[in-house]
Amino acid sequence: QYTDSVTYLMDGFKSANNSANNGKKNNAEEMKNLVNFLQSHKKLIKALKKNIESIQNKKHLIYKNKSYNPLLLSCVKKMNMLKENVDYIQKNQNLFKELMNQKATYSFVNTKKKIISLKSQGHKKETSQNQNENNDNQKYQEVNDEDDVNDEEDTNDDEDTNDEEDTNDDEDTNDDEDTNDEEDTNDEEDHENNNATAYELGIVPVNDVLNVNMKNMITGNNFMDVVKSTLAQSGGLGSNDLINFLNQGKEIGENLLNITKMNLGDKNNLESFPLDQLNMLKDNLINYEFILNNLKTSVLNKLKDLLLRLLYKAYVSYKKRKAQEKGLPEPTVTNEEYVEELKKGILDMGIKLLFSKVKSLLKKLKNKIFPKKKEDNQAVDTKSMEEPKVKAQPALRGVEPTEDSNIMNSINNVMDEIDFFEKELIENNNTPNVVPPTQSKKKNKNETVSGMDENFDNHPENYFKEEYYYDENDDMEVKVKKIGVTLKKFEPLKNGNVSETIKLIHLGNKDKKHIEAINNDIQIIKQELQAIYNELMNYTNGNKNIQQIFQQNILENDVLNQETEEEMEKQVEAITKQIEAEVDALAPKNKEEEEKEKEK
């Protein structure tokens, strides 16, 4: 039902544009291509900066052998590639300005006339070096620059309605939702520094995403803060950043032109390479990279704005289609109701999409904070006949888990809850009384982890299997699963029959405590279910009242329009009769004049 609803939502919006715009791209797609190009441009600048630093560190070697130095040759190639990119930007600056200053409407641009393949320009190949500090001989290889922009841009895409088919396995808006990655989080420094206690993803702190209550996530409060702040921004985002970027790029181009005036086919020309100008070039590249980051952030903000408004248009299209099917008048929205109507649309149609996007975001976030080592990714082909490993205790007594471990557990808990909610929403879409898992209990840092039960008598006849017992530190989802296992195991005792899987039937102390804990948790679940059910009913009643007022206003407008038309018709009839009477009054005079002329 989730897939059908998303497809149904987009069919009405896409079908009107499919035939007329087969050869065109929408603004959001072009903005993504622009971001990809800027990302590739940024990587080329970083590679050139590293190359310049290597040359400066080995000046004494390069002065001795300029002609056949591969490090110097690679630097010249990179500078030529950068010069081509800068020339490309200068020639197509009108296209950049048009994309940055466009209005946030779903319009199309003609790719044949205006677009000069931003995507292909961003996919240029650049040369990079593998440096070996203990060896003067350098080896170089071609590397492909086709990496995507950022994970958060994929998260922003979670609102991209042109990619709705991809959202079932996705990302943006993300989405948490539509937040942009303002810095390149793919840097090696981020992978090395995994012990930091505060992680941020764009402008949204990760802790806010992990610690948010599931109930607040359903109501969309945090998401709507991002939506409102985006819609409140004025048009022409990043125009100053673009001007600074173009001016600095022009200066870089002139600098590169002076340095690279040589024929690369003849390696002897490297003798004239001006090493003394590299310091000034490096300083200019640092300034250029800073301006490039600001421009990239502005483009991502603009892309986020486009995608949010595109989601709103898709929602309006869906509501109109539903109204036509039910024979109701098409709903209209004023500018004052824009944000509130967008909020209703997200709550009505976007909650399931939100679940999948948040889960995808958390997976990518976990991979970035805790990157897997190469040794972990290598598959083990040989199968050894080893004894089964015994599960270790969560932690020794009195030992606190690390900060990274807490973050990892928080991410896993949120992902598990999303899986539970998503499953219940799909299977019980028409029933409001879905039993959600409660928020996991936050463990105090000073709390000791209980490794075993002191009250448990270590006798095999006192339990069936250890797996269905749970302690107070378990998540509610785990408890719910173990409740089901418990009910299945104790069902034969209730009927007086012995199950084949139960060999030892003896209700010990631990079993009684276990059943009491189950009853307590069931009562807690009922209370939370009742609270959520009441909130859903209040929200549904509020929507019904708004819809009734909306339809009543439409009917009143129709009545006023009919009365106005009737009055206009009456006035037209009165004027027509008056004109006819004046014409009839003039007719006899005209006949008398004609008779007098005949007599003469």
UniProtKB/Swiss-Prot annotation:
Biased composition (Low complexity): 429-438
Compositionally biased region (Acidic residues): 143-191
Comp. bias intervals (Basic and acidic residues): 376-390
Polar residues: compositionally biased ranges: 128-141
Sequence intervals crossing the membrane: none
Keyword Calcium: no
Domain of life: Eukaryota
Keywords of this entry: Cell membrane, Malaria, Membrane, Repeat, Secreted
Function of the protein: During the asexual blood stage, involved in the sialic acid-independent (SAID) merozoite invasion of host erythrocytes by binding to host SLC4A1/Band 3 protein on the surface of the host erythrocyte.
Family in the record: Belongs to the plasmodium ABRA family.
Assembly, per entry: Forms a complex composed of MSP1, MSP6, MSP7, MSP9 and MSP3; within the complex, MSP6 and MSP9 mediate the binding to the host erythrocyte. Interacts with MSP1 subunits p19 and p42; the interaction is direct. Interacts with host SLC4A1/Band 3 protein (via the 5ABC region). MSP1 subunits p19 or p42, and MSP9 form a co-ligand complex that interacts with host SLC4A1/Band 3 protein.
Protein name: Merozoite surface protein 9
Source organism per UniProt: Plasmodium falciparum (isolate FCR-3 / Gambia)
Gene that this polypeptide is encoded by: MSP9
